[in-house]
């Protein structure tokens, strides 16, 4: 059994944890490989390019925050991910640093629970090209550097829902509902719910609200305003610039992202702790 280790090299704490983990794995004779960037920054080996890591690793270990785990999910190719939270919120990265060794031991003993998270599959066609990619949290179509308020049309199963006059539109999974969508006024959705949420960003339309839909629907998005400064990003990573000539289709992906679950965690406790629900504000 081999573990693929990915470290957020922008966090000194993650680098330190990565070095400790590698030292422990060598001592325990546990097979591992690092992605090339982590290996270079930690001055460790062996390494492999990130896009090829799934060919060597049976499990991924993500050392960082939720953003690090999101990046890993794009390359895991259904291989299970152990998320070690060394960031801030830690919705996706379920394990604390002090739980790192215990969860790896349990994986080695085949004593673990998997949580399958739905992904978005996104198809962008235009200018004679078609690009396909996936996202665990969300896909966002936004104004980019366009100075005005663009019009973005959204259709569901070929039925027009609205032409939003807004800074952008977020399409989020239940997993991604506590990310950008929440900041834009969207609802919190329990991760295993079989739904997507369509959330407009700063709509110049007083009656517009986020919409929750079944995840068996196909969503089509188009920018109706002329220009080429609009952007499409996925899980916080820029994918490409878009224009009215592009057609964007979003649906449920065939493959899930598979996370090693922390059986000691309760999602409602996590919400209460992370968002400080029920706590009085100190003066």
From Swiss-Prot:
<keyword id="KW-0963">Cytoplasm</keyword>
<keyword id="KW-0808">Transferase</keyword>
<feature type="binding site">
    <location>
        <begin position="178"/>
        <end position="183"/>
    </location>
    <ligand>
        <name>NAD(+)</name>
    </ligand>
</feature>
<feature type="binding site">
    <location>
        <begin position="66"/>
        <end position="67"/>
    </location>
    <ligand>
        <name>NAD(+)</name>
    </ligand>
</feature>
<dbReference type="InterPro" id="IPR016064">
    <property type="entry name" value="NAD/diacylglycerol_kinase_sf"/>
</dbReference>
<feature type="binding site">
    <location>
        <position position="167"/>
    </location>
    <ligand>
        <name>NAD(+)</name>
    </ligand>
</feature>
<dbReference type="GO" id="GO:0006741">
    <property type="term" value="P:NADP biosynthetic process"/>
</dbReference>
<keyword id="KW-0418">Kinase</keyword>
<keyword id="KW-0547">Nucleotide-binding</keyword>
<keyword id="KW-0067">ATP-binding</keyword>
<dbReference type="Pfam" id="PF01513">
    <property type="entry name" value="NAD_kinase"/>
</dbReference>
<comment type="similarity">
    <text>Belongs to the NAD kinase family.</text>
</comment>
<keyword id="KW-0521">NADP</keyword>
<feature type="binding site">
    <location>
        <begin position="137"/>
        <end position="138"/>
    </location>
    <ligand>
        <name>NAD(+)</name>
    </ligand>
</feature>
<keyword id="KW-0520">NAD</keyword>
<dbReference type="InterPro" id="IPR017438">
    <property type="entry name" value="ATP-NAD_kinase_N"/>
</dbReference>
<dbReference type="GO" id="GO:0005737">
    <property type="term" value="C:cytoplasm"/>
</dbReference>
<dbReference type="GO" id="GO:0019674">
    <property type="term" value="P:NAD metabolic process"/>
</dbReference>
<feature type="binding site">
    <location>
        <position position="165"/>
    </location>
    <ligand>
        <name>NAD(+)</name>
    </ligand>
</feature>
<comment type="function">
    <text>Involved in the regulation of the intracellular balance of NAD and NADP, and is a key enzyme in the biosynthesis of NADP. Catalyzes specifically the phosphorylation on 2'-hydroxyl of the adenosine moiety of NAD to yield NADP.</text>
</comment>
<feature type="active site" description="Proton acceptor">
    <location>
        <position position="66"/>
    </location>
</feature>
<dbReference type="GO" id="GO:0005524">
    <property type="term" value="F:ATP binding"/>
</dbReference>
<dbReference type="GO" id="GO:0003951">
    <property type="term" value="F:NAD+ kinase activity"/>
</dbReference>
<dbReference type="Pfam" id="PF20143">
    <property type="entry name" value="NAD_kinase_C"/>
</dbReference>
<dbReference type="GO" id="GO:0046872">
    <property type="term" value="F:metal ion binding"/>
</dbReference>
<dbReference type="GO" id="GO:0051287">
    <property type="term" value="F:NAD binding"/>
</dbReference>
<protein>
    <recommendedName>
        <fullName>NAD kinase</fullName>
        <ecNumber>2.7.1.23</ecNumber>
    </recommendedName>
</protein>
<dbReference type="InterPro" id="IPR017437">
    <property type="entry name" value="ATP-NAD_kinase_PpnK-typ_C"/>
</dbReference>
<dbReference type="InterPro" id="IPR002504">
    <property type="entry name" value="NADK"/>
</dbReference>
């Amino acid at each position: 059994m081999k573990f693929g280790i990915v470290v957020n090299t922008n966090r000194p704490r993650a680098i330190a944890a990565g070095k400790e983990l590698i030292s422990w794995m060598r001592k325990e004779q546990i097979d591992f490989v690092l992605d090339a960037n982590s290996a270079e920054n930690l001055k460790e080996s062996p390494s492999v390019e990130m896009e090829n890591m799934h060919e060597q690793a049976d499990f991924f270990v993500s050392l960082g925050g939720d953003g690090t785990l999101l990046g890993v999910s794009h390359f895991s190719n259904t291989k299970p991910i152990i998320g070690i939270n060394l960031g801030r919120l830690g919705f996706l990265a379920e394990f604390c640093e002090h739980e790192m060794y215990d969860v790896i031991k349990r994986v080695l003993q085949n004593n673990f629970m998997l949580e399958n998270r739905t992904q978005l599959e996104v198809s962008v066609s235009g200018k004679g090209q078609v690009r396909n990619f996936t996202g665990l949290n969300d896909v966002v179509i936004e104004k980019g550097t366009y100075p005005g308020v663009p019009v973005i049309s959204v259709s569901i199963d070929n039925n027009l829902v609205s032409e939003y006059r807004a800074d952008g539109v977020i399409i989020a999974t239940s997993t991604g509902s506590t990310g950008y969508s929440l900041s834009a006024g969207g609802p919190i959705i329990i991760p295993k719910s079989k739904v997507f949420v369509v959330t407009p960003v700063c709509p110049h339309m007083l009656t517009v609200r986020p919409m929750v839909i079944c995840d068996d629907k196909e969503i089509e998005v188009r920018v109706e305003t002329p220009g080429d400064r609009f952007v499409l990003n996925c899980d916080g990573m820029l994918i490409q610039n878009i224009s009215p000539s592009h057609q964007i289709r979003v649906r449920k992906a065939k493959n899930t992202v598979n996370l090693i679950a922390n059986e000691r965690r309760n999602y409602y406790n996590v919400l209460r702790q992370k968002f400080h629900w029920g706590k009085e504000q100190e003066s």
